[in-house]
Design a protein with these regions (language model features):
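Thr-Gly-centered strand-to-loop micro-motif
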Residues: 153-155
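Alpha/beta enzyme core
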Residues: 3-19, 28-150, 161-170
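Short acidic/histidine-rich active-site segments
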Residues: 157-159
Length: 170
């Protein structure tokens, strides 16, 4: 469980005489209850992934997690848009372009949920790439222009270094 993971990390840090701060992040959690359990166990940040839900349901779930987490000083990442591909037991299929994050929705999502950072879809995917990825830098620029929180890109493994560097610059 979450407590066991936190305990293992703390023991490893102590054994290594770790001198730097360590963050323990719960990635791609799909339920409010699991986010609460992770926060109570000692995680320092959580990602609530309601990206498979309709927009209004994603907003409601993400806001609920952010409201709870912020009471404990915990950082929350929300996700809007879908990354095609596979991650763990989850598989998302479809047209990568239509699954990308809409900048106007991103702005509304951030404002309504109170998240600390937003994971967006601009052409990356989870799992192994069948064809070379192409990041939609113009879409990223538009999102960056309208949100006031850090932007997170998931599914970057296999993305050419030049595209990652261009995304960072924009």
């Amino acid at each position: 469980g979450f407590e066991g993971t936190v305990d293992t990390v703390k023991r490893a840090m102590k054994a290594a005489d770790c001198k730097v701060p360590v963050a323990l992040h719960l990635d791609h959690c799909r339920t409010y209850e699991e986010c609460v359990q992770a926060i109570q166990a000692g995680y320092s940040s959580v990602m609530i992934d309601g990206s498979s839900l309709p927009f209004e349901e994603n907003v409601a779930l993400t806001k609920k997690v952010a409201d709870y987490a912020h009471c404990y000083g915990i950082t929350v990442e929300g996700e809007l848009g879908k990354l095609v591909g596979e991650e763990g037991n989850f598989k998302v299929e479809g047209d990568p372009e239509s699954a990308q994050t809409d900048p106007d929705q991103a702005k509304e999502f951030v404002e309504r949920t109170g998240i600390d950072c937003i994971a967006v879809s601009i052409g990356t995917q989870h799992g192994v790439y069948v064809a070379a990825p192409h990041l939609n830098i113009e879409r990223l620029k538009k999102i960056h222009d309208v949100v006031d929180v850090p932007i997170v890109l998931h599914g970057g493994s296999g993305t050419p270094k030049e595209q990652v560097q261009e995304a960072i610059r924009n």
